[in-house]
Amino acid sequence: AGYFDTTFVLKEPTYYTISRNTLYLTPGDDMTIKVTQTNTEAEFSGIGAEANNYMKFRLFPKGGSYLEAGGNLRGDFVSTKALVDSLAAIRMHTLDTLSNVSDAFKKLETARIKADIINSYICYASYSRMFAGVKTEEEMRAKWNEFNVSLTQDVTPLYKGDYE
């Protein structure tokens, strides 16, 4: 643990990662930052803080995004999807209410929300018991392909930008 003061010049907004914290820094930002191992406990104040306070709750794709490493898994895909969609709608609403961020930031984060939804749907197969009882590689492959095809109607609008 320690403290430091640094200044650097940015030509354009960009994301940075420090430990599990994702920062969004833009030219002209002037913040006091407390970085922690637990990203949700990080602290930001000053110019640029609003975007970074929002970023504290960024999901982790390797943990299945909205599935939160299986913690948000429900009894079946339909129930899990309903929860994922609800959590994404809340995240989208939170993003929409930010007032001191650029339209470019909102566009990037809207894309991240969509990507997290898609990732959550796809990761359901890995976190659920969908493959329980499957005995052969062929059977598993067939079940996996069937699941992927079933996702098409839910995922396609997200790729096309039709998510509200």
Map each language-model feature to its residues.
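A non-transmembrane, solvent-exposed segment enriched in polar/low-complexity residues
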Residues: 1-105
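Extended amphipathic alpha-helical segments with heptad-repeat/coiled-coil character used for oligomerization
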Residues: 110-164
